[in-house]
Amino acid sequence: MRNIVVGSRRSKLALTQTKWVINELKQLGAPFTFEVKEIVTKGDRVLDVTLSKVGGKGLFVKEIEHELLAGGIDMAVHSMKDMPAVLPEGLVIGAVSRREDARDVLVSKGNRMLSDLPPGSVIGTSSLRRSAQLLAYRPDLTIKWIRGNIDTRLAKLESEEYDAIVLAAAGLARMGWGDDVISDYLPFDVCVPAVGQGALAVECREDDDELRQWLSRLNDEQTERAVRAERAFLQQMEGGCQVPIAGYAEVKEGTVRLTALVASPDGKEMYKEIVTGADPEAVGRQAAAILSEQGAKALIERVKKELGD
């Protein structure tokens, strides 16, 4: 029986997600044994600065992809939102999991909702996408950067000068947390999620036909179509972690509906559009073209220049 080595980041969430995928493959009857190999990524190592300052793309996946290409592992489980828009040659996404709740959530002291937070409240996030949209909605809030895994951030909320933190609903759900810690679910019109948020990507080598065959059975077609639209938009906009870019698509009766957003880090400049169509990639490209024409592309170039990228 073939042994499949599965690459994963070391965080509790990453390992939980990896074990979930392995379990699903076992349930499907995949004729493999599995072994998890923990890999430390650049994004895990550099914790004292924001992701936008770490720079580059694929901060949480690059080292794992190197292992895949070198044959050190056979597949890898990622949060789809960590995946760069373009994969290295020789690698493919073999499966996209059914999407969990894609929304961002607020966890606050005193269980206050976003609209109830007093002016000047300090919000912890490590994401420019979240901070830009929060500031656009509530310019009177103060953003303070926070890094680390979910456990670390929840501990920092209790012990440090934060009134609330923003996290992904899906990550909390996978860790077994829900309404017991969540104070407010942020609606999409307040905070558009990251591209791929709530879904998992299982990456493998393009030429591994046997593994790909089993991964295809794990694939959720509806989620995959939605994510393809989001990633096509992301690819056209060419933004890494340095620019607030968001995209969320839903598929209903064969039609893809994509909400796409590009903003300035301070939230004062924002471009947002809803595009629908049958072809996911075409919808993503169309959204990018519309926003670019409105001024989003120029904004991205300006932000990159300011950050010295």
Curated annotation (Swiss-Prot):
GO cellular component: cytoplasm
Keywords: Porphyrin biosynthesis, Transferase
Protein role: Tetrapolymerization of the monopyrrole PBG into the hydroxymethylbilane pre-uroporphyrinogen in several discrete steps.
GO biological process: protoporphyrinogen IX biosynthetic process
Pathway: Porphyrin-containing compound metabolism; protoporphyrin-IX biosynthesis; coproporphyrinogen-III from 5-aminolevulinate: step 2/4
Cofactors required: dipyrromethane
Protein name, per record: Porphobilinogen deaminase
Family: Belongs to the HMBS family.
Pfam family name, one: Porphobil_deamC
Subunit structure: Monomer.
This enzyme's EC code(s): 2.5.1.61
Organism this protein belongs to: Geobacillus kaustophilus (strain HTA426)
GO molecular function annotation: hydroxymethylbilane synthase activity
Note accompanying the cofactor annotation: Binds 1 dipyrromethane group covalently.
Misc note: The porphobilinogen subunits are added to the dipyrromethane group.
Taxonomy of the source species: Bacteria, Bacillati, Bacillota, Bacilli, Bacillales
Name of the top EC class for this enzyme: transferase
Catalytic activities: 4 porphobilinogen + H2O = hydroxymethylbilane + 4 NH4(+)
Modified positions (S-(dipyrrolylmethanemethyl)cysteine) in chain numbering: 241
Domain of life per record: Bacteria
